[in-house]
Regions:
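Extended substrate/RNA-proximal surfaces in nucleic-acid metabolism proteins
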Residues: 1-98
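Active-site environment of divalent metal-dependent phosphoester hydrolases
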Residues: 19-21, 76-80, 104-107, 130-134
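Short, hinge-like loop/turn segments at secondary-structure boundaries
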Residues: 30-32, 87-90, 113-117, 142-145
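Conserved strand-to-helix beginnings and helix N-cap segments that scaffold or border functional pockets
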Residues: 55-56, 83-84, 109-110, 136-140
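A C-terminal functional module that forms or caps the active site or interfaces directly
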Residues: 85, 96-98, 104, 108-112
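Short secondary-structure boundary segments
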Residues: 99-102, 127-129
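Short acidic/histidine-rich active-site segments
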Residues: 121-137
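Mid-to-C-terminal alpha-helical segments outside catalytic/metal-binding sites
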Residues: 139, 143-171
Length: 171
């Protein structure tokens, strides 16, 4: 990664989107899956109705493991939460909510993100880029939408939180 330290390239850190499993809060060596040089873990919750065990595991990651929990693409999960109690409890936790930049292409996802923003929840933006063909980098469209809808200050707030979580200087 030495060649990537040139100012012409954006800083890149090794990280993983960690798929939730029952008991993850007690998993050994989980810290190895944190984003490089941070205590932040990007956690993908199950695409099913969450229960108290999922909630307890997330709490354990924060309180007992002292990790900064980032819930990956949170806007995708609302539709799976037919019983909203756990959803609401999850939204009250001191986690960071990561949303994908393409959230604005879907009315229900826009609504979820709007509620997060209006509730002043900590938010970061991700691209969910897997390749340059069918899952292309799309951060610009996400930032443009947020800027148009919520203002440049919101974009700066999201960007600064991302920098802070990754251990980069904030402006």
């Amino acid at each position: 990664t030495e060649y990537m330290k040139d100012d012409a390239y954006p800083a890149i850190k090794l990280g993983a989107e960690v798929c939730y499993f029952n008991g993850i809060g007690q998993a050994r060596e989980l810290e190895k899956l944190c984003i490089e040089d941070t205590d932040a873990i990007l956690l993908e919750l199950p695409f099913t109705q969450w229960n108290k065990f999922v909630l307890q595991d997330v709490i354990m990651l924060m309180e007992e493991r002292c990790l900064t929990v980032i819930l990956a693409h949170i806007e995708r999960f609302y539709a799976f939460q037919t019983r909203k109690k756990i959803w609401k409890e999850m939204l009250e936790l001191p986690v960071i909510f990561q949303v994908n930049a393409d959230f604005h292409d879907n009315r229900k996802k826009r609504k979820v993100v709007k509620k997060l923003i209006e509730s002043d929840k900590p938010l970061i933006l991700g691209s969910d880029c897997h390749n340059v063909e069918n899952r292309k980098p799309n951060l610009i469209s996400g930032y443009d939408y947020i800027s148009d809808k919520y203002g440049k200050k919101m974009v700066e707030q999201i960007d600064n939180l991302g920098r802070e979580v990754l251990g980069f200087d904030t402006k």
